[in-house]
């Protein structure tokens, strides 16, 4: 698997992957993204800002995620715990797969580990599959943050712990 930054012409394929992921989430009882998240405008913004990344192989694109460097506003306040450290970090958002390839999450996280010593990510309490992937890849549960007034389980990976 390889990773590259998305370009505007990738938008249709990216939105297709998000549609597949939303359907899977709903089928597995996870309401986190509903029927319309993430909206196309947000993905266009991620592409323009260089945050949107694609995971692909010789058969095509199988995954997408957004990677942000710097302070994540929703992580400024954490309840029921604390972050592992206050050092600079990158944040992974909106990771999704087309379901046709294995190891999408691990591939994305390994890429991120090559960029930063600290990675933060969050997920919905109903997203049991993502919780398992996050924990399997060495992240520690740190507490609860809020996204659009909805609680999320917050995790951090640091190469110092």
Per-region residue spans from a language model:
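Conserved GNAT acetyl-CoA-binding A-motif
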Residues: 91, 114-126
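Conserved GNAT-fold acetyl-CoA-binding loop/helix
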Residues: 22-42
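Conserved beta-strand in the GNAT
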Residues: 54, 60-70
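Conserved acetyl-CoA-binding loop-helix of GNAT-fold acetyltransferases
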Residues: 97-114, 131-136
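Conserved catalytic-core motifs of GNAT/GCN5-like acyltransferases
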Residues: 122, 140-154
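A short beta-loop-alpha structural element at the N-terminal edge
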Residues: 2-16
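Conserved acyl-donor/pantetheine-binding loop and adjacent beta-alpha core of acyl/acetyltransferases
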Residues: 66-100
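Conserved active-site alpha-helix within GNAT-family acetyltransferase domains
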Residues: 126-143
């Amino acid at each position: 698997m390889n990773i590259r930054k998305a370009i505007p012409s990738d938008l249709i394929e990216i939105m297709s992957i998000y549609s597949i992921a939303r359907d899977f989430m709903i089928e597995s009882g996870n309401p986190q993204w509903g029927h319309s998240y993430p909206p196309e405008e947000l993905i266009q913004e991620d592409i323009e800002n260089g945050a949107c990344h694609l995971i692909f192989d010789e058969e095509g694109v199988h995954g997408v995620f957004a990677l942000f460097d710097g302070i994540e506003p929703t992580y400024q306040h954490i309840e029921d715990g604390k972050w592992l450290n206050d050092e600079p970090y990158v944040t992974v958002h909106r990771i999704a797969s087309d379901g046709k390839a294995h190891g999408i999450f691990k591939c994305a996280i390994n890429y991120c580990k090559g960029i930063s010593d600290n990675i933060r990510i969050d997920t919905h309490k109903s997203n049991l599959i993502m919780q398992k992937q996050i924990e399997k890849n060495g992240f520690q549960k740190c507490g609860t943050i809020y996204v659009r007034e909805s609680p999320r389980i917050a995790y951090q990976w640091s190469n110092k712990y």
